[in-house]
Amino acid sequence: MTNEFLHFEKISRQTWQSLHRKTTPPLTEEELESIKSFNDQISLQDVTDIYLPLAHLIQIYKRTKEDLAFSKGIFLQRESKSQPFIIGVSGSVAVGKSTTSRLLQILLSRTFTDATVELVTTDGFLYPNQTLIEQGILNRKGFPESYDMEALLNFLDRIKNGQDVDIPVYSHEVYDIVPEEKQSVKAADFVIVEGINVFQNPQNDRLYITDFFDFSIYVDAGVDDIESWYLDRFLKMLSLAQNDPDSYYYRFTQMPIGEVEAFAHQVWISINLTNLQNYIEPTRNRAEVILHKSKNHEIDEIYLKK
């Protein structure tokens, strides 16, 4: 962290966990195991120490938003419309965004017992591989220009206005948008939007994605740690693809392990690290909260915007 983060309050794990009364996590060990990414590490102690205080903070932000909407309604002399509370979750590839997002979905649905919580990943807004090939940017997949940002902005606008929306589905197994398959996103009390690009600006700069967020989280870690987690995940994906010729990773199961490791390392250097340093990490100070992970995946520091 640099002077760029002077407008954040740095909070240790010990201090952060003391900001919320001790309660039993509202999920079981089995449920937690089922939602974590297969190369991630998280425990019920992490839920108690980190995520329950975070859910409480989100509750405060939601209440503040509702109070402001009510006051605006009085000022405008009209009834305020209920809108979903939208949470953006960003961070590098392989840093644990998906685990954080799925856990928040469970915690919010059980903290607000009558609330509905939708979870969306921005992978569905990647252009299909064929489109990327036609545009000559398949090697830039994951970079800002490989996303249909106008479609993402349109989705956020419709969700913000309480509409149901069908969006494309992306498969990491086939490494592409799944034809004819859609995720139906219903009007909800909470919508969590997770992806590497959720704090980035569209190229036309007419409207910022972050304008739609009521709360935002950046999952952070050291570059060397993220690289290690990425390579570990890549190799584990191979083990899952050994008997699945339809998987993108199947072709790598036919290669010597040394060649596979060299390929994965090159992908990390040329794509994921470049994307992280140039486009993802520079947006982290747009988050309300930064969760910093140590080498063993444990969150050791929290940065809260002042």
From Swiss-Prot:
What the entry lists under HAMAP family is as follows: Pantothen_kinase_1
Recorded GO MF terms: ATP binding; pantothenate kinase activity
What is its subcellular localisation? Answer: Cytoplasm
Which InterPro entries has this protein been placed in?
A: P-loop_NTPase, PanK, PRK/URK
The protein's annotated catalytic reaction(s) are: (R)-pantothenate + ATP = (R)-4'-phosphopantothenate + ADP + H(+)
Q: Which CDD domains match?
A: PanK (cd02025)
Q: What do the Gene Ontology cellular component annotations say?
A: cytoplasm
* Designated name of the protein: Pantothenate kinase
Class of enzymatic activity (EC top level): transferase
Q: Which GO terms describe its biological process?
A: coenzyme A biosynthetic process
Q: Which family does it belong to?
A: Belongs to the prokaryotic pantothenate kinase family.
